[in-house]
Curated annotation (Swiss-Prot):
The keyword ATP-binding does not apply. The lineage of its organism: Eukaryota, Viridiplantae, Streptophyta, Embryophyta, Tracheophyta. The gene is PEX2. Disruption phenotype: Embryo lethality at the heart stage. The chain crosses the membrane at residues 39-65, 72-97, 132-158, 169-199, 227-250. The three subunits of the retrotranslocation channel (PEX2, PEX10 and PEX12) coassemble in the membrane into a channel with an open 10 Angstrom pore. The RING-type zinc-fingers that catalyze PEX5 receptor ubiquitination are positioned above the pore on the cytosolic side of the complex. Zn(2+) 1 binds at C277, C280, C298, C301. Keywords: Membrane, Metal-binding, Peroxisome, Peroxisome biogenesis, Protein transport, Transferase, Transmembrane, Transmembrane helix, Transport, Ubl conjugation pathway, Zinc, Zinc-finger. E3 ubiquitin-protein ligase component of a retrotranslocation channel required for peroxisome organization by mediating export of the PEX5 receptor from peroxisomes to the cytosol, thereby promoting PEX5 recycling. The retrotranslocation channel is composed of PEX2, PEX10 and PEX12; each subunit contributing transmembrane segments that coassemble into an open channel that specifically allows the passage of PEX5 through the peroxisomal membrane. PEX2 also regulates peroxisome organization by acting as a E3 ubiquitin-protein ligase. Expressed in roots, stems, leaves, flowers, pollen, ovules, seeds and siliques. Component of the PEX2-PEX10-PEX12 retrotranslocation channel. Interacts with DSK2a and DSK2b. One of its GO terms (molecular function) is zinc ion binding. The keyword Transferase applies. This is Peroxisome biogenesis protein 2. It comes from Arabidopsis thaliana.
Amino acid sequence: MTPSTPADDAWIRSYQRLLPESQSLLASRRSVIPVAISRVNQFDAARLDVEMSAMLKEQLVKVFTLMKPGMLFQYEPELDAFLEFLIWRFSIWVDKPTPGNALMNLRYRDERGVVAQHLGKVRTGLEGPGLTSPQKIWYCVASVGGQYLFSRLQSFSAFRRWGDSEQRPLARRLWTLVQRIEGIYKAASFLNLLSFLYTGRYRNLIEKALKARLVYRSPHMNRSVSFEYMNRQLVWNEFSEMLLLLLPLLNSSAVKNILSPFAKDKSSSTKEDTVTCPICQVDPAIPFIALPCQHRYCYYCIRTRCASAASFRCLRCNEPVVAIQREGVSSGK
């Protein structure tokens, strides 16, 4: 008895019958790969963004230095909101990382859109779509608009003195409501901070509400660790501390006397140089001359130098000054 020969398309029918089952098995096994993002990098990125905003604000304020003093103070919330909007517009809105995130190799990923996809390809756990347009808009509204409204509300309530006891009941209730909302927000932020330290996800409440998680842009990033700046800073700090220790011990007049012969030739001195006091560089109000070189000084300048140094030398000719006398007087010290 010979076995029956299978039909030519039997393997095709078997493949089509087993394909849904195999795909379901693969999909069940290919869940989202857990990936750990450095908490330090995320905090550093936030700090860099804050410093970038401060630098932009400092440069923008310099434009209005010649205008009325204090004019920008009343518009400071609008200025901060404008700068934050610019950073959002040219980074998150166009699917680019913020300056801090770019330096830390981070980007925003929509956690709700992370699904098992690209079957058969090698995955690192960093795949996933970026933020959607509604997420970007809500991020701007919450971060830029929310911060601006709260800052304006605080300044307005303080100016209107809502917290005073003699205010109207409505103002008091509004002030109490604002304080309660602020307290609830701070408590929620603290709980979110504890959750972030434990899980490494969502630095603030805005990211948590929008499911916008920071992940690495590239799975492999070359970290070029350089201690050149740190070494330079340490050397400069030690050098400056040494100078601060030694400078009070040095005699400035003695150093000038040592360096004056090398500064310029004696023949290059003009008539104006011989008239002015070589110490304060002005015309002496009470002119005195140094003996025996006969060079003019202010009385206070040369008297102070002679009292502070036992062997004071003339700053013009480097000759020892043995006595001083008022100009036009035959004798005196």
